[in-house]
UniProtKB/Swiss-Prot annotation:
A motif (D-box) lies at residues 61-64. One of its GO terms (molecular function) is SH3 domain binding. The N-terminal destruction box (D-box) acts as a recognition signal for degradation via the ubiquitin-proteasome pathway. InterPro entries: Securin_separation_inhibitor (IPR006940). One of its GO terms (biological process) is DNA repair. A motif (SH3-binding) lies at residues 163-173. Phosphorylated at Ser-165 by CDK1 during mitosis. Phosphorylated in vitro by ds-DNA kinase. This is Securin. Regulatory protein, which plays a central role in chromosome stability, in the p53/TP53 pathway, and DNA repair. Probably acts by blocking the action of key proteins. During the mitosis, it blocks Separase/ESPL1 function, preventing the proteolysis of the cohesin complex and the subsequent segregation of the chromosomes. At the onset of anaphase, it is ubiquitinated, conducting to its destruction and to the liberation of ESPL1. Its function is however not limited to a blocking activity, since it is required to activate ESPL1. Keywords: Acetylation, Cell cycle, Cell division, Chromosome partition, Cytoplasm, DNA damage, DNA repair, Mitosis, Nucleus, Phosphoprotein, Proto-oncogene, Repeat, SH3-binding, Ubl conjugation. Residues 35-94 are annotated as: Disordered.
Length: 202
């Protein structure tokens, strides 16, 4: 970019630019360049010199044309090959699906113990159904803990008791009478410990 700006300043016209390859030619003789139909003489510059590769002859452009022709031929030859590949991949896909179908029963036979991890039905523990002859819709069951009765006679006893009521818990002895002396409260908390064995030598 710096060389392009320098060439613009040298030519005096901001619109004319010289390519970097043309501007960096080596040699002591002045070279004549045609810019916008006029011939100008550019003198070799002093200062930093960059080693640029020599300009390629124009014959190489013909080689590029032949390369392009060769690539076009290779593209034409690759066209039918690409059409054959999808059919080949389709055959592979059908073979893979057949193999996958045949391997599904083999996987079930290889791991039969997976089904034995859960021998019970979890829904059995969630359902507490009563026979139709027992109607409990008329009972106020809000706040009643879940009770599982093993025998039917205990279930009949439960229906004979009537609607459930909260049961009063027996109060502990130290809360029964708040006017007791501390010694009487401590006497209720005393626990007899086994006698100490003094025969053991330390």
């Amino acid at each position: 970019m710096a060389t392009l700006i320098y060439v613009d300043k040298e030519n005096g016209e901001p619109g004319t630019r010289v390519a970097a390859k043309d501007g960096l030619k080596l040699g002591s003789a002045p070279s004549i360049k045609a810019l916008d139909g006029r011939s100008q003489v550019s003198t070799p510059r002093f200062g930093k010199t960059f080693d640029a590769p020599p300009a390629l002859p124009k014959a190489t452009r013909k080689a590029l044309g032949t390369v392009n022709r060769a690539t076009e031929k290779s593209v034409k030859t690759k066209g039918p090959l690409k059409q054959k590949q999808p059919s080949f991949s389709a055959k592979k896909m059908t073979e893979k699906t057949v193999k996958a179908k045949s391997s599904v029963p083999a996987s079930d036979d290889a791991y039969p113990e997976i089904e034995k991890f859960f021998p019970f039905n979890p829904l059995d523990f969630e359902s507490f159904d009563l026979p139709e002859e027992h109607q409990i819709a008329h009972l106020p069951l809000s706040g009643v803990p879940l009770m599982i009765l093993d025998e039917e006679r205990e279930l009949e006893k439960l229906f004979q008791l009537g609607p459930p009521s909260p049961v009063r818990m027996p109060s502990p002895p130290w809360e029964s009478n708040l006017l007791q002396s501390p010694s009487s409260i401590l006497s209720t908390l005393d626990v007899e410990l086994p006698p100490v064995c003094c025969d053991i030598d330390i």
